[in-house]
């Protein structure tokens, strides 16, 4: 009796996969000689997009990508920031070509994002000229992903069907310009808590840090409002938070456009001729609930005042947010997050640099003693 069902499954699934593969194959054929670009009609359509069309339902990049990173690195390359001139786009000029598989509405979304870069920064997305070897190809390749900064030859920015949303396009293009995610900053532990126990094991490497010696934040403070900041549930294996801001009234990961700090960093990276002074708040004014799995209800975070910092300070002495005294206590059984008002011990440091790899097993009886000795900070033992 099961045979007919088996036959149905075998005949239906390959057809679906075959369609997806054909689209991908078509894109790969187009990449090599594409010169198609946005036109005046696309930009006119972009100006007519409604707020709902621009800022409607947002699907996190990691969900679209099935919990894979949206940053793709060349083989053998380590994760590092962009501070060397060779990784920047010369003269802030990004030659590009786009896939013919985008609909008029999708082309309008791309045009809107490009227009924002042109209006707020000196970055210029320019149509690729025939025979130009180094350029950005924007197409429906496989999910949402980009390399960081400029690479040689044809560079792919994949914006597939699930990625065609304004905020996602702005986010991915900022990777193209040269920036990693905000939560990967070397100083992130001063501003967010990583809840390792709640992170999907296959995504632990998404919470590494960018090497300070190989990146620059151009004197800008940690930015909770950055378009490049993931949300509190990013890569969660159990629906509970994977990272939380130390400023308890702040929210992360719900940006729908550039923050002021995003724009400031881009303009400083590319030495844009005009840059306005920016004051960046370190906390959101909104009152945001945190889900508590133990009580199955929402518990509100208490409000605290906003703090602002002058963005004119130089890169040698970057402005820093006041580091709150609260520390996090995480239940090993449920993933529940609570705040502890006591200051963490100044001696609370990991003794090795790879604690993240086994952070989801901190309280496993087999390695508990080793983890408590080598990784007390990551495991929240102190």
Swiss-Prot record:
InterPro entries: Astacin-like_dom, Caenorhab_nas-7/8, MetalloPept_cat_dom_sf, Peptidase_M12A, Peptidase_Metallo, ShKT_dom. The active site is at residue 172. Disulfide bonds join 122-272, 144-163, 348-382, 355-375, 362-379. Disruption phenotype: No visible phenotype. In a nas-6 (hd108) mutant background, enhances slow growth of nas-6 single mutant. Zn(2+) binds at residues 171, 175, 181. It comes from Caenorhabditis elegans. It is found in: Secreted. This is Zinc metalloproteinase nas-7. It is an enzyme of class 3 (hydrolase).
